[in-house]
Amino acid sequence: MSDQIKFIVDSLNKEPFKKNYNLITFDSLGPMQLLQVLNDVLAEIDPKQDVDIREETPEQTAKRMLSLLGILKYKPPGNATDMSTFRQGLVIGSKPVIYPVLHWLLQRSSELKKRAYLARFLIKLEVPSEFLQDETVADTNKQYEELMEAFKALHKECEQLKTSGFSTAEIRRDISAMEEEKDQLMKRVERLKKRVETVQNHQRMLKIARQLRVEKEREEFLAQQKQEQKNQLFHAVQRLQRVQNQLKSMRHAAADAKPESLMKRLEEEIKFNSYMVTEKFPKELESKKKELHFLQKVVSEPAMGHSDLLELESKVNEVNAEINQLIEKKMMRNEPIEGKLSLYRQQASIISRKKEAKAEELQETKEKLASLEREVSVKTNQTREFDGTEVLKGDEFKRYVSKLRSKSTVFKKKHQIIAEFKAEFGLLQRTEELLKQRQETIQHQLRTIEEKKGISGYSYTQEELERVSALKSEVDEMKGRTLDDMSEMVKKLNSLVSEKKSALAPVIKELRQLRQKCQLTQECDEKRTQYDSCAAGLESNRSKLEQEVRGLREECLQEESKYHYTNCMIKNLEVQLRRATDEMKAYVSSDQQEKRKAIREQYTKNITEQENLGKKLREKQKAVRESHGPNMKQAKMWRDLEQLMECKKQCFLKQQSPASIGQVIQEGGEDRLVL
């Protein structure tokens, strides 16, 4: 109880109550103050409960709190008699009643807020059946039930969206970005429309463009179907290969094996399968059923808090301790008799456990073998699709590895030579750049000097003359060469070309294969990038379209709610208009019978009747006031007379009693002797 009070005080001192209590001040609160604290906690859960209990009677306060606690599904401890004491304690503000309620409410405040909010919309209003005979009331009640179901669906969807990780800020940013993009697209469309309208036959061109778009979509759809059919064919080929491998393995086993070994293997499989079916699977099924039964039982029970769980854990520990004690007593009582039986039982349980472990290990090994076989078939299919060859095995694979190693060494050498050439080329390119820069600076300096001296263009003309003379000398040299030199050179070149061709023939052949593979890898990379970009674009388009669909659905729901609301208002106005027209017809009608049916006539008749009744009552009141004084005197006289008669009766009874015989009674100044 002290922990309960401490938790209540700590919770009341926090937000949003800020009561600033301690254990002593909280324990010293009176009944009215405790009820006000309870009402404040209930008002935090349901704002409708925010009232001052001093303005209510205790019965009204208790009724209001009990109704809200019933909605929140609070279960008071005890049976029906305890329920009556609970109600009485709630009326008078009893601490043993209010403390558990406060503890329960403060433990589950967030959950109870949600429950109170939902109860405001989901508690159905009970309409009497006689009122439902009216069509308007029945239609309104039906719309009310439909709106309640729609609220349930929307609330469920809202909770799913809250738990899905979408934030409202991100959604708003996305909506604003989409609106901006929509405006930009609309502007672009308008500009394109204006630009297209000036072109001749633009309608025909638009029609052709529309047909082109439809055909492209159809082409994409057909490509998608083709890809799906390829996937189906690939899966079918995989299944065929798997079945062929199984058939091959079975044929191989049948070719090598004898009938005795086959029968032995089949007997082992039958034993294993019968054990799995008769012993292992029924036990697992029974355990799963028990677990399912326990889970269903837990789900059907109301939600429990931390204190309830601690209480259940303590009960479970106590029961386990009692079970252990009983087992120890039984073992002590039956130990000399059942010594051998317990030994046999232990051995049987050990053997059964080993059997179960081996069965599980065998099952796991079979599953692992099947998965490895599937993986091998997938890898073989991938290699066959990549280069169209079968997977190498044994000596072929070794020869392929040795050949690949020799080629890799040659490739490394060639790669090293290419790297050296690249480095030399970079060095020469850098020196060329430096020389060009230096030449430009010298040319610039030379031009400035020529401009200063007044002979601009001299260096250019001199360079041209030198170039022309050099060309002329080269031409002269070329003319001076003899035909013998040319023939020798041709022979040398031909011999060199033939040698190089013979030396480079295997390299060119290997290079051609490598180039084909490189082209395939490049095409694969290009296709992969195209696929990734296309997938990203389609994903973004899909997300945009989903957001647009969600927004349009929300708009549709809003428009539907507006439509239902306007229909209700129209029906109400039609009913009022019908009543007003009926009233006007009855009021304007010359028939007195119709006029009597009019509401105005009925109200005027009721008013006159009430006025006459008021006059009669005022006259009666006046008569009562006039006769009030005499009647009060008369009533007083009657009461005095009753007292006098009662006194005489008492005196007479005293005279008649036997105790008064022989006594002298003096009354009214006279002496009497009663015999």
Swiss-Prot record:
Residues with Phosphothreonine modification: T61
GO cellular component terms given for this protein: centriole; centrosome; ciliary basal body; cilium; cytoplasm; intraciliary transport particle B; sperm midpiece; sperm principal piece
Q: Where are the N-acetylserine modifications?
A: S2
One GO term under biological process is: sperm flagellum assembly
Q: Which residues form a coiled coil?
A: 132-258, 306-389, 433-453, 509-627
Q: Where in the cell is it found?
A: Cell projection, Cilium; Cytoplasm; Cytoplasm, Cytoskeleton, Cilium basal body
Q: Assign the protein's first listed, main location to one coarse class.
A: other
Q: Indicate whether Phosphoprotein appears among the record's keywords.
A: yes
Q: Which Pfam families match?
A: IFT81_CH
> Which key words are in the record?
Acetylation, Cell projection, Cilium, Cilium biogenesis/degradation, Coiled coil, Cytoplasm, Cytoskeleton, Differentiation, Phosphoprotein, Spermatogenesis
Q: Where is this region: CH (calponin-homology)-like region?
A: 2-121
Task: Name a GO molecular-function annotation.
Answer: tubulin binding
- Domain text from the record? The CH (calponin-homology)-like region shows high similarity to a CH (calponin-homology) domain and mediates binding to the globular domain of tubulin.
Membership in a protein family:
Belongs to the IFT81 family.
Role this protein plays: Component of the intraflagellar transport (IFT) complex B: together with IFT74, forms a tubulin-binding module that specifically mediates transport of tubulin within the cilium. Binds tubulin via its CH (calponin-homology)-like region. Required for ciliogenesis. Required for proper regulation of SHH signaling. Plays an important role during spermatogenesis by modulating the assembly and elongation of the sperm flagella.
Q: How does it assemble?
A: Component of the IFT complex B, at least composed of IFT20, IFT22, IFT25, IFT27, IFT46, IFT52, TRAF3IP1/IFT54, IFT57, IFT74, IFT80, IFT81, and IFT88. Interacts with IFT74; the interaction is direct: within the IFT complex B, IFT74 and IFT81 mediate the transport of tubulin within the cilium. Interacts with tubulin; the interaction is direct. Interacts with IFT57 and IFT70B. Interacts with RABL2/RABL2A; binding is equal in the presence of GTP or GDP. Interacts with IFT88. Interacts (via the IFT74/IFT81 heterodimer) with RABL2B. Interacts with CFAP61.
Indicate what this protein is called per its UniProt record. Answer: Intraflagellar transport protein 81 homolog
Q: Which gene encodes it?
A: Ift81
